[in-house]
Amino acid sequence: FYNFKDPKKHRIVGKTFFYAMLVVVISSISGLIKHPHSAFFQFLFGISILVLCGILRGVRSIFLMKGAAVTNLEWAYTILLGINGIWMLGMSAYHFNAGTMIAIPILFSVFGTMSVLDVRKNWQVFSQPQLLHRLDWMRLHASTMLGAFTASTTAFTVNAAHFLPWWAQWFGPTMLILPLQFYFGGKLKAMRKKAAPAPIETM
């Protein structure tokens, strides 16, 4: 939400975040290839796919808000998100049974569940995009980007913030950013209620 009221600066920051996350995704895939049996790199891989699908939905929601049509890209990253969600839930069960440090199976479960719920959301939204108001798309954009930021920050703190207590490394980003997601989502929801009920196609 940096310079949210200044679209030009907001786009610059948004594009920087988008390409930075693409680098993170590529590096996490490389890490998993090198260390396929490492719970840490498995978690980073799952998070990176979640972030990839998130930033794609976040960016595409702006285009859809402006009247663009739903394309195969929407369904492609929705399918990828669903596969990743099922995989993360499976890894959660595996690491619970294996006795891995408790934070890993918990977060696999949390982010896996988020992925599955997002698949349901995508199906509802992309099946009937004409029913959404511009502010509905904006709310989807904001919540998705904040969700991607939460996931990527979690990966960063786990990887680099070893000076923090273990619970802060693994759960701190969610504890700090989730309230912001609810706050801005609530503001956009309130704006939506005040707005005219006209769908996108009539604007």
PLM region spans:
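Alpha-helical membrane insertion/targeting regions
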Residues: F1-M203
